[in-house]
């Protein structure tokens, strides 16, 4: 493989040609099943458990007809994320660097913002365990939650470090979480007469699409609409799926699942229990021979199927949680926020089914949320590893200069958002320096991919444990929820450029790897939808 790197780290683009090998033989769907359900499991952590039930409990069924539309729009986004990896064995972030390095580094900054407040991901799961166990005894609730947050972070680190293959760890955890959440909530619905009694009205609402008269691709808001809930609605739209940056994990899971040309690329394996696998700095393409095209089409059809499975699995989970909220919370006029949605329903189940009912509901909430830390740490570690291993390696010679440039770039995006929380601001000053130093040092000293990955995953967990004891930066948390909608629009636009224009020019198979016109149009529609939603939110907030 050609390793000479001539392009400028800022003003050039990733231009190393692909290695060329035949398309990997398709082994059957059962052998590669995984990325779709991982995506579904991740998606269940916020929109499905928190935001959609909140909207239903407060506004009834006003928005439900829009939910399947927003869910299906995630399909085209995922499909093109997976297509690039299927054709090249590279992550989509490598593709963004092939568009241009400046664009690649902008996308990297978006990712760092999204994963900056890592301590919060275990908060709700820890709250569930505190409510169930009341452990440690004698401690106040806040201290108990912090204890469980630290413990869950340590458990997360140990599982990932000792799991032989990082992807398999995430796959198992997310699959268990997705199945427990899906069937647990379905069982809760079926076991509750009050919920079943409103089933007819609930499902009839899917046929009542209330359209914004000014912008038909946006929903009309109800008469009692609270403008402050605009951010909730936008977040619900984005998280009718994983959302924004989170969706890009699908590209990595396709890669480590050995799909298509990724079968020629090694996986991330544990330095403690796994055997090292070679991970090249650039991907592997194929020529347009009849045999290769036949195999390629099998992989693409499987990508469609796997992606559809994840979208539908996630969509029906939203149906169960929204139905439960409509049957229990809405009639009582209860509109609790965040984790309170589950605890309130847990108390209702305690009245109906006794203490076991409350515990079951809290356990379901735990399964919804515990898995997020695994996937967040895995995804951020992969993104950092890609930029250090592919973007910096072989292109930088000075650690101080590289650290300074990286630090300034990241600080511009992150530090202003943490103003108002002095201790957190101080932590981020140090954190961004360590990230920059780790990336520069690993690139110059030729670290292997997995060494970068596990080093950053460890840093991710350490920072998460520290953040538990700090004041959360409200500006950052609010910004990330809205930023993800903008990122979804930006990344969809990037995929239109990458897969329709750039990929056919640099791939030996040319137009054979380009999406069809139908796919292009559907992704274009999705992109317009995300841009309109972003603009609408800005307009509403500015008055």
Indicate where each model-derived feature is located.
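Extracellular loop-to-transmembrane helix junctions
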Residues: 27, 54-79, 94-105, 147-148, ...
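C-terminal membrane-solvent junction of multi-pass transporters and transport-like membrane proteins
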Residues: 173-176, 382, 386, 392, ...
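Hydrophobic alpha-helical segments and their helix-loop junctions in multi-pass secondary transporters
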Residues: 180-225, 243-251, 493-507, 533-542
């Amino acid at each position: 493989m050609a390793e000479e790197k001539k392009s400028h780290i800022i003003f050039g683009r990733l231009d190393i040609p692909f290695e060329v090998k035949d398309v990997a033989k398709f082994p059957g769907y059962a052998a590669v099943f995984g990325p779709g359900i991982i995506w579904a499991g991740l998606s269940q952590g916020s929109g499905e458990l928190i935001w959609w039930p909140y909207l239903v409990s407060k506004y009834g069924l006003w928005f439900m007809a829009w939910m399947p539309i927003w869910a299906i729009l995630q399909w085209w986004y995922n499909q093109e994320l997976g297509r690039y990896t299927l054709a090249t064995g590279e992550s989509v972030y490598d593709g963004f660097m092939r568009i241009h390095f400046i664009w690649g580094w902008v996308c990297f900054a978006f990712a760092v913002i999204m994963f900056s407040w890592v301590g919060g991901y275990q908060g709700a799961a820890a709250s569930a365990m505190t409510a169930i166990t009341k452990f440690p005894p004698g401690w106040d609730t806040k201290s108990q939650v912090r204890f469980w947050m630290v413990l869950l972070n340590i458990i997360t680190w140990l599982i990932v470090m000792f799991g032989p293959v990082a992807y398999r760890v995430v796959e198992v955890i997310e699959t268990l979480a997705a199945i427990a959440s899906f069937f647990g909530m379905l069982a809760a619905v079926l076991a509750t007469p009050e919920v079943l009694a409103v089933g007819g009205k609930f499902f009839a609402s899917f046929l009542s699409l209330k359209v914004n008269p000014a912008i038909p691709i946006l929903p009309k808001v109800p008469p009692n609409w609270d403008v402050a809930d605009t951010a909730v609605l936008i977040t619900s739209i984005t998280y009718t799926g994983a959302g924004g940056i989170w969706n890009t994990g699908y590209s990595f899971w396709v890669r480590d699942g050995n799909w298509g040309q990724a079968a020629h690329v090694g996986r991330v394996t544990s330095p403690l229990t796994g055997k090292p696998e070679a991970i090249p700095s650039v991907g592997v393409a194929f020529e347009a021979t009849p045999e290769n095209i036949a195999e390629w089409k099998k992989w693409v059809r499987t990508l469609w199927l796997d992606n559809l499975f994840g979208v539908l699995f996630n969509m029906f989970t939203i149906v169960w949680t929204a139905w439960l909220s409509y049957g229990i919370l809405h009639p009582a006029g209860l509109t609790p926020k965040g984790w309170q949605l589950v605890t309130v329903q847990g108390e209702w189940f305690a009245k109906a089914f006794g203490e076991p009912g409350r515990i079951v509901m809290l356990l379901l909430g735990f399964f919804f949320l515990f898995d997020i830390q695994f996937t967040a740490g895995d995804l951020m570690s992969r993104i950092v590893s890609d930029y250090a291993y592919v973007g910096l390696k072989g292109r930088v010679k000075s650690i101080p200069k590289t650290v300074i440039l990286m630090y300034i770039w990241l600080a511009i995006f992150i530090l202003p958002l943490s103003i108002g929380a002095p201790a957190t601001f101080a932590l981020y000053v140090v954190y961004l320096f360590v990230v920059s130093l780790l990336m520069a040092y690993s690139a110059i000293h030729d670290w292997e991919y997995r060494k970068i990955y596990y080093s950053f995953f460890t840093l991710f967990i350490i920072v998460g444990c520290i953040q538990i004891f700090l004041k959360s930066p409200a500006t950052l948390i609010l910004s990330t929820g809205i930023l993800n909608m903008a990122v979804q629009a930006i990344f969809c636009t990037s995929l239109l450029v990458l897969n329709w224009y750039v990929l056919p020019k640099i791939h030996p198979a040319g137009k054979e790897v380009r999406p069809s016109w139908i796919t292009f149009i559907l992704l274009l529609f999705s992109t317009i939808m995300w841009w309109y939603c972003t603009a609408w939110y800005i307009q509403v907030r500015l008055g």
